[in-house]
UniProtKB/Swiss-Prot annotation:
A GO CC term assigned to this protein in UniProt: extracellular region
Record keywords, A-Z: Cytolysis, Dermonecrotic toxin, Disulfide bond, Glycoprotein, Hemolysis, Lipid degradation, Lipid metabolism, Lyase, Magnesium, Metal-binding, Secreted, Signal, Toxin, Zymogen
Taxonomic classification: Eukaryota, Metazoa, Ecdysozoa, Arthropoda, Chelicerata
Entry protein name: Dermonecrotic toxin LiSicTox-alphaIA2bi
InterPro entries per record: PLC-like_Pdiesterase_TIM-brl (IPR017946)
Amino acid sequence: MLPYIALILVCWSVLSQAAQTDVEGRADKRRPIWIMGHMVNAIAQIDEFVNLGANSIETDVSFDDNANPEYTYHGVPCDCGRSCLKWENFNDFLKGLRSATTPGNAKYQAKLILVVFDLKTGSLYDNQANEAGKKLAKNLLKHYWNNGNNGGRAYIVLSIPDLNHYPLIKGFKDQLTQDGHPELMDKVGHDFSGNDAIGDVGNAYKKAGISGHVWQSDGITNCLLRGLDRVKQAIANRDSGNGFINKVYYWTVDKRATTRDALDAGVDGVMTNYPDVITDVLNESAYKNKFRVASYEDNPWETFKK
């Protein structure tokens, strides 16, 4: 009898702890923060940045003349203090990323929950944007989502530098639908990264037929200074109750003082070359009760309510 009683007590203890953890998680009113490792273009860098504290990464995607995604490559110039020349073939990178974001894989990194693809569409003509979106979708479907069969679980943000390239979004969506996987759009968000006027960005989304799943970026290379005026405009839109923005991130944030300024402004994400710096600031007494590192249970398309 005693072993059975002991077993019951152990089970009750485990269930009680789980329930308490669940209640505490739902009661946590801190803003979740996405720490975005900047310019992660080689497979080996995925582990490097996640191990430094990143829960998301940004990867550059270059295109060939026929609008095929070709390399994960930035090139010169890039941020001060970084190597600009690391690269992989795009599909090889997707396979490595899939390994890092698929539960059960030997290379799985549970903390890696979101990927921003910085789409270098500046090499394309405006009339190639739709085709670029279609080809991007086909590559992601095959090499990252594994044709819908236990592929990578990370959320994906398609970051486009040119408002005129909004047809890329429709091409991407149409291709997934044509290939029988429209449900994967639930894992896809959007960003226009050209620091355009917020109103102009909103108009581009209207043309693209997009409402929701919107991250708004603002920033500049770490070699230069940039104020937070436009960040605050984006945050005002996000918090207005009738804006089109769900989340705001700031780049490139490498210094503690800049991190504090961005958090004080109310951003949801910071893109950085030094994730450990952001982690250190989040653990400071002034911030640890207001912010926390986002987990997979945090919806990246949901506007945070205080």
